[in-house]
């Protein structure tokens, strides 16, 4: 076996690429039309298949402050969601619960502003639970299964062990760990950094 292939095989068995996820918004098709006058327009693909960064941007408004030029991710979803960090929440005057994406029941709301209008969300603001997307083929090599919580060692400028990283396994996933900016800054994350699931 060639050295490069051997290195790749070892990496696949031990290490996972880290990604930092900044504040962003998911909207429904009706909300996209209300905010922008049309459905979302893809600007570039994201690491997870089928998902994209939209050309459109919104302002997220809370009781105490707002963030302008916030990224919108597509495609449209059945229910809106605003993913922010705990630090972002202080600026907005919102205390976001830590939840997995899609679990918006009972979360705080916010106002979204686009060029064509406003959308008031009664719920949907959360801080994303740190998690890892794992392709089904990689799960046995990493020794993980769907919905499992694992400890993750980061190999970053300021190495950290993160507990309670939720594993999500699916055949379409690219294997990646998603941290929010609070977590990424805490460990000194840079693009290309890796993590390892601890036994």
Tell what function each PLM region has.
Residues 1, 198-199:
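C-terminal end-of-chain micro-motif
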Residues 1-15:
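Short, low-complexity, charged amphipathic interaction modules
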Residues 156:
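Acidic, glycine-rich active-site loops and adjacent beta-strand->loop/helix elements
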Residues 19-63, 68-115, 120-147, 151-153, ...:
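Short beta-strand-centered segments at strand-helix junctions
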């Amino acid at each position: 076996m060639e050295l490069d292939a051997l290195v790749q095989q070892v990496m696949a068995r031990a290490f996972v690429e880290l990604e930092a996820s900044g504040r962003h918004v998911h909207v429904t098709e009706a909300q996209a039309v209300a905010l922008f006058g049309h459905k979302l327009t893809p600007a570039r693909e994201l690491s997870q298949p089928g998902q994209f960064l939209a050309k459109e941007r919104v302002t997220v408004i809370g009781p105490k402050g707002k963030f302008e030029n916030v990224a919108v991710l597509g495609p449209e979803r059945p229910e809106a969601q605003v993913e922010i960090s705990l630090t972002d929440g202080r600026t907005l005057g919102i205390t976001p619960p830590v939840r997995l994406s899609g679990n918006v029941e009972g979360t705080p709301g916010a106002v979204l502003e686009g060029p064509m209008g406003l959308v008031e969300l009664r719920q949907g603001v959360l801080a994303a639970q740190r998690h890892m997307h794992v392709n089904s083929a990689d799960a046995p090599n990493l020794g993980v299964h769907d919905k499992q919580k694992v400890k993750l060692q980061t190999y970053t400028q300021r190495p950290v062990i993160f507990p309670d990283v939720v594993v999500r396994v699916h055949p379409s996933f690219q294997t990646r760990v998603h941290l929010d900016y609070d977590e990424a800054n805490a460990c000194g994350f840079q693009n290309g950094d890796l993590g390892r699931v601890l036994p």
